[in-house]
Amino acid sequence: PNQIWQAEQQKYPIIMNGGYFVMGAGKSVSLLCREGEVLAVNSQEEIRSQKSYYPTRGIFQLSKNGYFSTDWAYTTTDGVTYTYEQPSPNKSGYEPQPAPSAYFPTRGVKLNAETAIGGGPILLKDGSVRNTFIEELFDEESGVAPESYHPRTAIGVTANNKVIFFVCEGRSVTEGVKGMNMAMMANVLKSLGCVDAMNLDGGGSTCMLVNGQPVIKPSAGAQRAITTAVALK
């Protein structure tokens, strides 16, 4: 994030880490849409017990009419990204659901966002706690550790379309601060007035800069090189 702050000539007062990526390779495995162009997509396939699953994972988007929301999304093999009102009901260890399409798991809506970031799981949707880490295949094997305490990053929106950027420390970098799990984050974001909210990459990636200054201590002792970020202009 500090490199982004410097490269963008300090024009973003708030910068926060974004979606998931392959460490070392710099490849995003979360959706990224900027100025209406999809630059990366959410993971299209996850392998569990030698079976292929096709999860609908979360995105946080700004529509072209100026409203923020969380949605479950999937990009098909022909390159079309659809959003859905409900996630595909996958569960690791059970028979995989069909690959999402224009009509499954619900009627899909073609992504028409001004900007969007992928992550997951979705924590809140339409004012209700959802925490769909099971359906999105964000299990322990994914590395997200949804039920364990770690540094976390999330983004949400209130009923009056105000965006909430959220980070928390963890792993006892500050004595006694162990972090949060997904259930705790969902409740905290709801208490802050969010009606929609989504988890982003956490752990050693968690970082927020306000006017170039970090607001929490990184769990690894220094900022991690990340692939995507969310910034307030």
Where are these regions (language model features)?
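Gly/Ser/Thr/Pro-rich low-complexity, intrinsically disordered segments
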Residues: 1-233
